[in-house]
């Protein structure tokens, strides 16, 4: 049966990737359909109730800068906000917030239901309609056919999903939800490389059974940080603390004594788990010299008693989970509400993707989220936004777009995935970016909002706010540049109290702000340089841009040098065995990867600078490079 409407873009899956993909496509004016097996689980936080963190918070800010939803949702649902690495440099500072699961999901659903150009429909997808290597639509569980010019798959852990608790396993996409078996089988028929990954979740605890009097409280920051560039502290609900406990030798003994009942150690689970979020049994075995591990006790919301013990993800049997939980301080009488479990699922080698998230083998088919081997809500949201945008551009027969590595963590993400692939769940860190001084949380809008506006992703309200911030920054920098003091000026004693060495020559406000001991707040508290501007974001930019101006300029110069051939196109049909001088290894890797540009080719493992030089000469020979450009 054929559905009575056709669409420009269909998004399959309503998690963090799917919601951003659907909204991005709809924001650009394309007629978009979001298909989900259950409308009630749109925007659901399947694992930990938190958004952000090192590297992850940067992605959330970038999604927000391009008009995405995640930052606004957490601003309205966050029950504890903190800035991580607050004492370090601005490049590695990151925002993190605990979420009220119910508030978060409700905000996402409300936003989706009221989004122009977006239709929601509840049906699981079993099949793709593919004709002559181009996707034409999808077929649902009930045999309903939907036609579209582009399809985005954001299916999370549902493809061939298998849940493990102890030595027992069952099919499932997550606890309480069925897996997607038919679609997984269909995708395995297509020419993609497929493998298995694993992730897990801890048991949930009833807070009424916990003795908080013996636990260490961890409060949020005051004043609270804000995630969205359009956000405000007044959006935040009531703030509450998290708590900290620890595992101990008794905990570890319980785990060691029951490893034979672990599906991981019994060889039942084939998939590789996340390196940076290991199960408690993995931690105990890998770090055998440690007799304790810190566990963060995170509330799941303001209207529930459920707690999320971050750090004891496990697939051990339920009776062992009870022993583990009750061995920890404050949890001696704890009641488990939901057991922890591991889940295994299919993922597809992201090296089979273009930088637009379109698959190399099926035109118009895009993948985003855990299907690409990533882990985390934030990584999923970033991929979803970019895949939705590029699906929209594809449906309009326009050229796709993705940011470079030096423009955004979103650029680092797709570049890492599409050039190197991954053997384990991929998580973003600031250390993955070569140019992280330029890729800060605080300047995500300055890097991306103008481009997002050009692409149709940014509405008038956000655009007006962005331009007001730019104006405020420029005016304040000009004011500080043109305001001077000298050793004979009125107020010099007030200034010298803030300086390590007294001022002995004339200096502008910007000169003084460059001093390590001087902050913008201190400078503008002085009579000569008062008042500070009301726009706190603009004030922060003024301080960072002035203090780090030399370092920023140096990094920008390095980027310019490295970009000489970043976008030099490589022919899609080029047989690299025809390129004289390339080694057999390089030929094999290039013919397998089929990189779109020289920049991408240069980042494939084993591709040497010499090989790039040979390719430049070949491109010149076949007329795809201007004379002299190979030496540029």
UniProtKB/Swiss-Prot annotation:
Summary of the function given for this chain in its UniProt record? NAD-binding protein involved in the addition of a carboxymethylaminomethyl (cmnm) group at the wobble position (U34) of certain tRNAs, forming tRNA-cmnm(5)s(2)U34.
Per the record, a Pfam family?
A: GIDA
Is Flavoprotein found in the keyword set? yes
Q: Which GO CC annotations does the UniProt entry carry?
A: cytosol
Organism classification: Bacteria, Pseudomonadati, Pseudomonadota, Gammaproteobacteria, Vibrionales
Q: Write out the GO biological process terms.
A: tRNA methylation; tRNA wobble uridine modification
Names of the cofactor(s): FAD
Which residues does the annotation say bind FAD? 13-18, 125, 180, 370
- The main location class comes to cytoplasm
Q: Where in the cell is it found?
A: Cytoplasm
Similarity section: Belongs to the MnmG family.
Q: Which organism is it from?
A: Vibrio vulnificus (strain YJ016)
Q: What interactions and quaternary structure are annotated?
A: Homodimer. Heterotetramer of two MnmE and two MnmG subunits.
At which positions is NAD(+) bound?
Answer: 273-287
Q: What is the protein name for this chain?
A: tRNA uridine 5-carboxymethylaminomethyl modification enzyme MnmG
Ordered alphabetically, the record's keywords are: Cytoplasm, FAD, Flavoprotein, NAD, tRNA processing
Classification via PANTHER family: GLUCOSE INHIBITED DIVISION PROTEIN A, PROTEIN MTO1 HOMOLOG, MITOCHONDRIAL
Which HAMAP family does the entry mention?
MnmG_GidA (MF_00129)
Top-rank taxon? Bacteria
Q: Name one GO molecular function term.
A: flavin adenine dinucleotide binding
Q: Does the keyword Ribonucleoprotein apply?
A: no
């Amino acid at each position: 049966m054929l559905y009575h409407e056709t669409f420009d873009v269909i998004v399959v899956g309503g998690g963090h990737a799917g919601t951003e993909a659907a909204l991005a496509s709809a924001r650009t004016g394309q007629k978009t359909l979001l298909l989900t097996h259950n409308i009630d689980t749109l925007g659901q936080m399947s694992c930990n109730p938190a958004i952000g963190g090192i590297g992850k918070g940067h992605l959330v800010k970038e999604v927000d800068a391009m008009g995405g939803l995640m930052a606004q949702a957490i601003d309205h649902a966050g029950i504890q906000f903190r800035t991580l690495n607050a004492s370090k440099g601005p490049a590695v500072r990151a925002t993190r917030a605990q979420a009220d699961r119910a508030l978060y999901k409700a905000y996402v659903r409300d936003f989706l239901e009221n989004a122009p150009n977006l239709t929601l429909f509840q049906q699981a997808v079993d099949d793709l309609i593919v004709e002559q290597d181009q996707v034409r639509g999808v077929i649902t569980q009930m045999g309903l056919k939907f036609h579209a010019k582009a399809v985005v798959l954001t299916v999370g852990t549902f493809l061939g999903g298998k849940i493990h608790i102890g030595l027992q396993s069952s099919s499932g996409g997550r606890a309480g939800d069925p897996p997607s078996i038919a679609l997984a089988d269909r995708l395995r028929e297509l020419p993609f490389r497929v493998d298995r990954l694993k992730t897990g979740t801890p048991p949930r605890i009833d807070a009424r059974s916990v003795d908080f009097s013996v636990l260490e409280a961890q409060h949020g920051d005051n004043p609270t940080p804000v995630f969205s560039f359009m956000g405000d502290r007044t959006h935040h609900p009531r703030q509450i603390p998290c708590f900290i406990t620890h595992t101990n030798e008794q905990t570890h003994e319980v785990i060691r004594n029951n490893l034979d009942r672990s599906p991981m150690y019994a060889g039942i689970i084939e998939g590789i788990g996340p390196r940076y979020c290991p199960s408690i049994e993995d931690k105990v075995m890998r770090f055998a010299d440690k007799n304790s591990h810190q566990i963060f006790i995170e509330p799941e919301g303001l209207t529930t008693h459920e707690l999320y013990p971050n750090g004891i993800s496990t697939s051990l049997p339920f009776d062992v989970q009870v022993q583990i939980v009750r061995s920890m301080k404050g949890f001696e009488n704890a009641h488990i509400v939901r057991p922890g479990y591991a889940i295994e699922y299919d993922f597809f080698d992201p090296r089979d993707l273009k930088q637009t998230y379109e698959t190399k083998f099926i035109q118009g088919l895009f993948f985003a989220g855990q299907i690409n081997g990533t882990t985390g809500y934030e990584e999923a949201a970033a991929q979803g936004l970019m895949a939705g945008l590029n699906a929209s551009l594809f449906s309009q027969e326009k050229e796709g777009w993705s940011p470079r590595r030096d423009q955004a963590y979103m650029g680092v993400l797709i570049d890492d995935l599409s050039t190197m692939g991954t053997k384990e769940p991929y998580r973003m860190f600031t250390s993955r970016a070569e140019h992280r001084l330029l890729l800060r949380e605080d300047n995500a809008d300055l890097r991306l909002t103008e481009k997002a506006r050009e692409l149709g992703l940014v509405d008038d309200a956000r655009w007006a706010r962005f331009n007001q911030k730019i104006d405020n920054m420029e005016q304040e920098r000009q004011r500080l540049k043109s305001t001077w003091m000298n050793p004979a000026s009125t107020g010099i004693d007030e200034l010298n109290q803030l300086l390590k060495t007294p001022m002995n020559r004339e200096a502008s406000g910007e000169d003084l702000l460059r001093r390590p001991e001087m902050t913008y707040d201190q400078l503008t508290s002085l009579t000569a340089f008062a008042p500070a501007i009301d726009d706190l974001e603009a004030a922060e930019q003024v301080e960072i841009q002035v203090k780090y101006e030399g370092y920023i300029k140096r990094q920008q110069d390095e980027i310019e040098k490295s970009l000489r051939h970043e976008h030099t196109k490589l022919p899609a049909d080029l047989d690299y065995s025809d390129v004289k001088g390339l080694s057999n290894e390089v030929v094999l890797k290039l013919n397998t990867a089929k990189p779109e540009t020289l920049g991408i080719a240069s980042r494939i493992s084993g591709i040497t600078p010499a090989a790039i030089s040979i390719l430049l000469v070949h491109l010149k020979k076949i007329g795809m490079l201007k004379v002299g450009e190979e030496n540029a």
